[in-house]
Amino acid sequence: MRKEERYKGVLNWFNEHVPVAETELHYDNPYQLLIAVILSAQCTDKRVNMITPALFRDFPTPEVMAASTSEVIFEHIRSVSYPNNKSKHLVGMAKMLMSDFDGVVPSDIDELQKLPGVGRKTANVIASVVYNKPAMAVDTHVFRVANRIGLTNNSKTPLETEKELVKHIPEEQIPIAHHWLILHGRYTCIARKPKCEECGLKPWCKYFLSPKKT
C-alpha cells in the first residue's frame, strides 16, 4: 500500500468517526493548560486532573505562582510523578512568563521552549491546542501508533515522527490529528495487545495487514 493511500484512508476514517477530538486535560485558559501539560509528563491525565482544581484555585495567575516557592507548589502536586522537579519548573515558568512575556503564554514554539519545564512536545501541544497552529506533539502514544499503523517508516525519535507526520497530514488537520492519534493509542492501539478486532483502521494498518504481527 502506498503511503499516500494509507494516510488518506486513516485521516478520512478519523474525520468521519471522530469528528471531535480534544485533550482530556481540564483547563480554562492557556496558563492552566501549560501547567497541566507540564504536570502530565510521564503521568496520566486522570491524575493531573485530580490535582489541578486546587492548584488553579490557589495560583490563578502566573503572577501569583511566581510569588510562591517550589516547596509550596510541591505540596499541591506531590501525587504526580517527579513532583520535586515539576514544582521547580512551575515556579520558574511563572517567573519567566512575568519577566519576559508580560504574563501571557507565547504562541511561538521556540519562545515556549525557553520556559522551564517546556520541551518540544509541550510547546507543540500549546501551539496546537491553544493557538490552533499546525504543530504535531509526539508523545508515546503518537510515536507508537504512527509507527505501528505505518504512517512513519520506523522513525527512531519523536522528532523524526513529527517531521514525517507534518509532511503528509494536511496543515489544517494537524491540530486534530494530534488528538486522534493520542486517543487511538490510549484506548484502542494500546502498547500491549492492541485491540485490533475493534479498530476501524484495519484496512490501512501496516501492523494488522502484516503476516507476522510483532
Predicted regions and their residues:
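Catalytic cores of DNA base-excision repair glycosylases
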Residues: 2-213
